[in-house]
């Protein structure tokens, strides 16, 4: 640089020399002049060469007043490493020096003059804002001049540390905020401003605190700001001269952010980071799993930058490590994507915590997730030795830009002091909100409960959510089921009253193992969807660390205790640790107690825990009285039991899962696998279920004496005492509720401890059932309602003896026809087995009894009682004092069964059977079961032949010569599945052949293929012949007289006749028409599946309305078809009786009691409509409950001792005016269970 001349003309010159113009690289002679009265303001001039300047031959090529300069900065670009840039309001002027020393000397000279000029200008013009007062001392290493050495007394104006001229691109916020074009990016110690060219006011001022991240790519630089910025969240993209400038911008801005972090560090240290033991309370977490809003971040945003003491690349080389500021939540959600290892690893506040985190992987960088409030630890907490180099890769991926990343790894992880990669790294915040905190990373950062947790508590307090897992044997569980489970069953758990955030109450030695608890404790997230955090520390109680992918095991805990429903599972699994079902998933809690190797939950023992958390409104924990745990949450309206654990049913009950892998889903109060848990194990036959059958499975839900009623069956139980199921090929999961609500809950479906070897086959597959009905208020007690429908199939079904308790429909009785189970009576066995069972001994034998080692298909599909609600309700406990002996009614619109009702009467009523192409083979119960091959496989499901056991009429009707078999004994239920030998065009679903107990048997064998139910009703008159049209009241009378006198005889007669609305037989009722025969019932047509009150449920069957005016004159009433298909005398009048509604709903199927022969004097009204039923009604539910005790005369004109009401005649017999058993409660669909009291069958 040439020395300024001493002459007067050059007295104001401060510096001269040759410098280059950056673009052209031409050398020019520059002169720096100070302000003078003669020469004017301080200015920078350049000339073509020194000669021209000295000789004053020409004016300077350019003169730039320093007062007008926006800012003066050192710069560098790809061409020139030593630039000094002057920014004016309208242009950017740069000079390039050949060396750094030269650059610095010019820069200092310019800066001094600029500061003076600016000060003078500000003092004179009072222009303070926007002036490019001296470039304030920049952070070291940025090449900025330090302080203004010659300010004199003039304070410099607000100085911009750096100014870059950039072109904002129409992208991101640039477009939305219309910030496009040439701007100056002006950096101060706390802000970044965009000042448009030729403008003095900043268009946008962004706080450094608002910046989430910044980066550069090539010659583009971007800044992402959060929603706290004035512009809202978004990015600014700007183009600069080249990548070197972009990189310089990136590094400079990061350095400024680091400086600000250092400035605020002391304050944040005092706030939180310095003391882990005093966590600040933080706002409740939202469910932003990974991106809690900045508002949720808890600390001031500054804390973001505080804690991490990473150094920028430069500082890492020589800078102080603490200077690097890693941005925490608000800073850098943007940087989340970039890993930022922090160089300091905090001293772990508690050994437990540190330990707990140790097993976590290294540097788990969590997405913005954890902006949430990582409360970074102050550098003081961080052990410097732990420093690990910050990976400074910026989001832009440029190498050095990475400093910015480190500076704000917007992930909270960065904000935590301590490198996430450090195994011992622990977030200072107790909430684990910092992403580095593994807990927080995977739980939706839920610091809530932690606010008050002493850090020493470890993660125990973190589990503020329901620990749906294991429970201690003796300790009560918190209402929400918190358990801190130790594997051995220490049962560490929070006491029910304990606040989640508070330290748990430890019982016994648990206090000693508090550290383990803390370590073991895991915070639960509200959303199960988030991977549950694994146990953070392996404690002795935990076998392994569950993978974060493990599924939450939600096992509600109830305070142990008897009826209150405290149901402590025998063993609880730790909250997140799945049971053995998912061994790879995580820790497994061993059962706290297993007695005798058998799962024996009862009041004295711990209840097994439930697989489901009770989500139904009315479900109460099952009282301790229950013996076991059901597999499924009772979804039936009246179910009382709490859901059972289904996560690992095999572990709890091997039998719970059928060989096909289906879980037993029976919702009923009694577990669908009804157990004859009673002392009597004689029902082994009932237990023995052929594994071969695809559908049916037999099981008993009775206790004790009921077993005696089950005929011994040669086959051993399918299920061994070990509970292993023999493979059953059933395709369906049994979804039907189980009936024995009094004694069993879902937990009761398994044998009680006293009878562990007696295990039902659980693979009974029935079509899904909806609900079960409970005891009706008006139902008779004890044996009055007992009914034994014996479907004596040739294949050897077990006899079903229902007791009062069986009223609740169970899968066995309802869905599987358990209520109507056919049982092959051994010839030696007396009928007393058919007699009324002990009321208190519920017994259900599924129709799917052994059938040559094959399970029978379910007899019906029951859809639940009319008032069944879709919402699960705690099922009402049936009083054992008033058991329902009749099996629960099937609730399906179509019970796909062929039901043949057999009677012990002298003869079967001859009915319109001529047209039956497929005779229903009726076999006396004493007959040996026909071989399985004999059993017809063609009929769709099962046909129940309901006719008095007389082979004469039976042969007549069926055309099958069974005479050699001998007459069926009076008590024998003459029901045989038609053998294959007997050709039959099976009705598609059910052929209900119902004959009244008379000498003439109305064969109801499935005749022409009825689409759903072929309901043949035998007319209770001997003279009635095949297609007889009418039936006289006298016929019914004679039928009544012919029937055995005494309650049983009347009951039997009533059972069959009332079935049909009286002795007349089923008048115009299709197999599943719910015939409301009770005179007391609402006279208006009812909707099936709806109680008389009018609840209606539509099913895919046509609506039929019966009209009381018309009397049925034909055995065949064309219900569905409107024409007598098989009935020769199909009376058209019946069609009007059964007015067919066009709507396909199942409404109005209820026959009015009056027209059904509500009085004994109108028995003929029900004159067989059986024939016509073949084509017509798809589903008919016969509502035929008759209380014979109250109205014996209605059944038979001749006075007889009032027989006990035929048990389980669904919904009021047509003649019984007293049938007020809340028939409505009964199933609206074909519950045709008409077993007569077999006393006459002795």
Curated annotation (Swiss-Prot):
Bias kind Basic and acidic residues: ranges: 592-610, 776-785
Motif interval(s): YXXM motif 7: 941-944
Ranges for region Disordered: 262-430, 592-616, 668-693, 771-900, 918-937, 1057-1146, 1190-1242
Region of interest (Mediates interaction with PHIP), residue spans: 3-137
Location in chain, cross-link Glycyl lysine isopeptide (Lys-Gly) (interchain with G-Cter in ubiquitin): 1186, 1189
Post-translational modification: Serine phosphorylation of IRS1 is a mechanism for insulin resistance. Ser-307, Ser-312, Ser-315, and Ser-323 phosphorylations inhibit insulin action through disruption of IRS1 interaction with the insulin receptor INSR. Phosphorylation of Tyr-896 is required for GRB2-binding. Phosphorylated by ALK. Phosphorylated at Ser-270, Ser-307, Ser-636 and Ser-1101 by RPS6KB1; phosphorylation induces accelerated degradation of IRS1. Phosphorylated on tyrosine residues in response to insulin.
Biased composition (Basic residues): 354-363
UniProt entry tagged with the keyword Nucleus: yes
Location of the motif YXXM motif 3: 612-615
Residue(s) carrying Phosphotyrosine: 465, 612, 632, 662, 896, 941, 989, 1179, 1229
Compositionally biased spans, kind Polar residues: 918-928, 1073-1085, 1102-1114
Motif (YXXM motif 4): 632-635
IRS-type PTB domain mapped to chain residues: 160-264
Residue ranges annotated as motif YXXM motif 9: 1012-1015
Compartment(s): Cytoplasm; Nucleus
Chain span(s) of sequence motif YXXM motif 8: 989-992
The name this protein goes by in its record: Insulin receptor substrate 1
Gene: IRS1
């Amino acid at each position: 640089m040439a020395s300024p001349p001493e002459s007067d003309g050059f007295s104001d010159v401060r510096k001269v020399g040759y410098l280059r113009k950056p673009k052209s690289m031409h050398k020019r002679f520059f002169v720096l002049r100070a302000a003078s009265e003669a020469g004017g303001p301080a200015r920078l001039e350049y000339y073509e060469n020194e000669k021209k300047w000295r000789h004053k031959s020409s004016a300077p090529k350019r003169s730039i007043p320093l007062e007008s300069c926006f800012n003066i900065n050192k710069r560098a670009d790809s061409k020139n490493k030593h630039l000094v840039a002057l920014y004016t309001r309208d242009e950017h002027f740069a000079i390039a020096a050949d060396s750094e020393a030269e650059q610095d000397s010019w820069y200092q000279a310019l800066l001094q003059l600029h500061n003076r000029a600016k000060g003078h200008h500000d003092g004179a013009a009072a222009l303070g804002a926007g002036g490019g007062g001296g470039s304030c001392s920049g952070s070291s290493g940025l090449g900025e001049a330090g302080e203004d050495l010659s300010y004199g007394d003039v304070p410099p104006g607000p100085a911009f540390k750096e100014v870059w001229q950039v072109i904002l691109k129409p992208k991101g916020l640039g477009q939305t905020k219309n910030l496009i074009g040439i701007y100056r990016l002006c950096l101060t110690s706390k802000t970044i401003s965009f000042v448009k060219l030729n403008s003095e006011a900043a268009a946008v001022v962004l706080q450094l605190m608002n910046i989430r991240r910044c980066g550069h790519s090539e010659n583009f630089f971007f800044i992402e700001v959060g929603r706290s910025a004035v512009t809202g969240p978004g990015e600014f993209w700007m183009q600069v001269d080249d990548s070197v400038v972009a990189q310089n911008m990136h590094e400079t801005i990061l350095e400024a952010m680091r400086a600000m972090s250092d400035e605020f560090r002391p304050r944040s240290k005092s706030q939180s980071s310095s003391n882990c033991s005093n966590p600040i309370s933080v706002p409740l977490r939202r469910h932003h799993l990974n991106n809690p809003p900045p508002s949720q971040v808890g600390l001031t945003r500054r804390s973001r930058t505080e804690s991490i003491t990473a150094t920028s690349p430069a500082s890492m080389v020589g800078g102080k490590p603490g200077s690097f500021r890693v941005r925490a939540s608000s800073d850098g959600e943007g940087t989340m994507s970039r890993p930022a290892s922090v160089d300091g690893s905090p001293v772990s506040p508690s050994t437990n915590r540190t330990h707990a985190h140790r097993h976590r992987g290294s540097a788990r960088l969590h997405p913005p997730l954890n902006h949430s409030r990582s409360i970074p630890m102050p550098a003081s907490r961080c052990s410097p030795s732990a420093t690990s180099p910050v990976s400074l890769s910026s989001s832009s991926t440029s190498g050095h830009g990475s400093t910015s990343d480190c500076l704000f790894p917007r992930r909270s992880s960065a904000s935590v002091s301590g490198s996430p990669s450090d195994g011992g790294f622990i977030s200072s915040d107790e909430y684990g909100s910092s992403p580095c905190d593994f807990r927080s990373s995977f739980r939706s950062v839920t610091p809530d409960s932690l606010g008050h947790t002493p850090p020493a508590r470890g993660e125990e307090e973190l589990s503020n959510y329901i620990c749906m897992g294991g429970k201690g044997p003796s300790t009560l569980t918190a209402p929400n089921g918190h358990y801190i489970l130790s594997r051995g069953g220490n049962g560490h758990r929070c006491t029910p009253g304990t606040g989640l955030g508070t330290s748990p109450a430890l019982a016994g030695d648990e206090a000693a193992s508090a550290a383990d608890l803390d370590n073991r404790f895991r915070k639960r997230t509200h959303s199960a969807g988030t991977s549950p955090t694994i146990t953070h520390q392996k404690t002795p109680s935990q076998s392994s660390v569950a993978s974060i992918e493990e599924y939450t095991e939600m096992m509600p805990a109830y305070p142990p205790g008897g009826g209150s429903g405290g149901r402590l599972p025998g063993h609880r699994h730790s909250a997140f640790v799945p049971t053995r079902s998912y061994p790879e998933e995580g820790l497994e809690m061993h059962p706290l107690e297993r007695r005798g190797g058998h799962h024996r939950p009862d009041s004295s023992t711990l209840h097994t825990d439930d697989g489901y958390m009770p989500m139904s409104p009315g479900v109460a924990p099952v009282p301790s009285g229950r013996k076991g745990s059901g597999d499924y949450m009772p979804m039936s309206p009246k179910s009382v039991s709490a859901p059972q654990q289904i996560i690992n049913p095999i572990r709890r009950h091997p039998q719970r899962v059928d060989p096909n892998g289906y879980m037993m889903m029976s919702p009923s109060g009694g577990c669908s696998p009804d157990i004859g848990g009673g002392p009597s194990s004689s029902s082994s036959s009932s237990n023995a279920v052929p594994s071969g059958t695809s559908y049916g499975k037999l099981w008993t839900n009775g206790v004790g004496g009921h077993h005696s009623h089950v005929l011994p069956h040669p086959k051993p139980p399918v299920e061994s005492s070990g509970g292993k199921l023999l493979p059953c090929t059933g395709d369906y999961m049994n979804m039907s509720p189980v009936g024995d609500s009094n004694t069993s809950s879902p937990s009761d479906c398994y044998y009680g401890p006293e009878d562990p070897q007696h295990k039902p086959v659980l693979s009974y597959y029935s079509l899904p059932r909806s609900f079960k009905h409970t005891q009706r208020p008006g139902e008779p007690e004890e044996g009055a309602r007992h009914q034994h429908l014996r479907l004596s199939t040739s294949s050897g079904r077990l006899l079903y003896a229902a007791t009062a308790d069986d009223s609740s429909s169970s899968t066995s009785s309802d869905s599987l026809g358990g209520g109507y189970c056919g049982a092959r009576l051994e010839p030696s066995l007396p009928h007393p087995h058919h007699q009324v069972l002990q009321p208190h001994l519920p017994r259900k034998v599924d129709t799917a009894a052994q059938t040559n080692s094959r399970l029978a298909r379910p007899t019906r599909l029951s859809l639940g009682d009319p008032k069944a609600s879709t919402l699960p309700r705690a099922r009402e406990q049936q009083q054992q004092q008033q058991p329902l002996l009749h099996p629960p009614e099937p609730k399906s619109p179509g019970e796909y069964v062929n039901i043949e009702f057999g009677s012990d009467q002298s003869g079967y009523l001859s009915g319109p059977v001529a047209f039956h192409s497929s005779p229903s083979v009726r076999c006396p119960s004493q007959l040996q079961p026909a071989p399985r091959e004999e059993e017809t496989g063609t009929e769709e499901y099962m046909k129940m032949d309901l006719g008095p056991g007389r082979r004469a009429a039976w042969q007549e009707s069926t055309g099958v010569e069974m005479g050699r078999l001998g007459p069926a004994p009076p008590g024998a239920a003459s029901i045989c599945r038609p053998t294959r030998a007997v050709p039959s065009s099976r009705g598609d679903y059910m052929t209900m052949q119902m004959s009244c107990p008379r000498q003439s048997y109305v064969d109801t064998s499935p005749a022409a293929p009825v689409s759903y139910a072929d309901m043949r009703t035998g007319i209770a008159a001997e003279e009635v012949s095949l297609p007889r049209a009418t039936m006289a009241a006298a016929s019914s009378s004679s039928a009544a007289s012919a029937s055995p006198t005494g309650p049983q005889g009347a009951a039997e007669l009533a059972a069959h006749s009332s079935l049909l609305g009286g002795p007349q037989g089923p008048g115009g009722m299709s197999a599943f028409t719910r015939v409301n025969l009770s005179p007391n019932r609402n006279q208006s047509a009812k909707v099936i599946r709806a109680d008389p009150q009018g609840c209606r449920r539509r099913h895919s069957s046509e609506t039929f309305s019966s009209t009381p005016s018309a009397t049925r004159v034909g055995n065949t009433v064309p219900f569905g078809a409107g024409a007598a298909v098989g009935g020769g005398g199909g009376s058209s009048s019946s069609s009007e009786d059964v007015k067919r509604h066009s709507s396909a709903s199942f409404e109005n199927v209820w026959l009015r009691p009056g027209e059904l022969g509500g009085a004994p004097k109108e028995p003929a009204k029900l004159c067989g409509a059986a024939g016509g039923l073949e084509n017509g009604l798809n589903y008919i539910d016969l509502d035929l409950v008759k209380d014979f005790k109250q109205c014996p005369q209605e059944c038979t004109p001749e006075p007889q001792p009032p027989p006990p009401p035929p048990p389980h005649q669904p919904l009021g017999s047509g003649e019984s005016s007293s049938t007020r058993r809340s028939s409505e409660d009964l199933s609206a669909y074909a519950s045709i269970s008409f077993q007569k009291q077999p006393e006459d069958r002795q």
